């Protein structure tokens, strides 16, 4: 087996499809994926590629490259159970911050694999568009440039993959944009207008960069595909789960109802709380994340947005 993809959700299936154009791919998931994989495999076979096969966890461990697409909140437990070789070549495609330990993805992973064997996938993309073969540009961040290029060379013809360093900047950008995307959904749901939305996203990008710079993230990362690119996509599209959370909150629905109706994981909800606690610990100014955290805890949506526009 060349590439093992862990995670049977929409994102995991999309990545399995993407890597399946050029490579033998197996997907590992607890759920039955026979029906979801049928259309994807039909498309791969029509291109002359091998179909994706679902396998169990034990068989999935014997691969050249590993792609991880599971919720960040379960990532530590997953690593504990998977028992990957310490030198396994891993690409993490999960965007968020672990709430329990206030840990970034790379901090979780370093307890289980060699940091030089780790890559992080960032940039603007939606699973629904990838499975249609629509073009996009992504970034593979790693301290190991050769490994980043190895993963980049495995991507399909419709994805332009850049290899860059600054793994901390890439993962913070990927996590933080989900937070701003919720606020973007609220802004649109309240019909506050294009000017307010532009102000929100611009200040959101500044806030993201400020937070990331504290931990060593590079400015160019936040101004590129991993930061600005992913932010502008996620905060403006109904295809974004986090954006849809914001739309629901704008209708004065309780968060529990919004998440139940969503039926999928929106990483930005828990990431918001993690960011606020980290920012409080280190004295980082995060007005948008801080106000959004109050909104998620039940503050009036109109009051939150009014306060946010004045503060951000």
From Swiss-Prot:
Lineage, uppermost ranks:
Bacteria, Pseudomonadati, Campylobacterota, Epsilonproteobacteria, Campylobacterales
Q: Write out the catalytic residues in the record.
A: 177 (proton acceptor)
GO cellular component annotations of the record:
cytosol
Under Pfam families, the record lists: NAD_Gly3P_dh_C (PF07479), NAD_Gly3P_dh_N (PF01210)
Q: Which HAMAP family does this chain map to? A: NAD_Glyc3P_dehydrog
Query: What gene does this protein come from?
Result: gpsA
Named in its record, the pathway it takes part in is:
Membrane lipid metabolism; glycerophospholipid metabolism
Q: Which keywords, in A-to-Z order, does the entry hold? A: Cytoplasm, Lipid biosynthesis, Lipid metabolism, NAD, NADP, Nucleotide-binding, Oxidoreductase, Phospholipid biosynthesis, Phospholipid metabolism
Q: Which residues bind NADPH?
A: 11, 30-31, 95, 127, 241, 265, 267
According to UniProt, the name of this protein is Glycerol-3-phosphate dehydrogenase [NAD(P)+]
The enzyme's main class, written as a single word, is: oxidoreductase
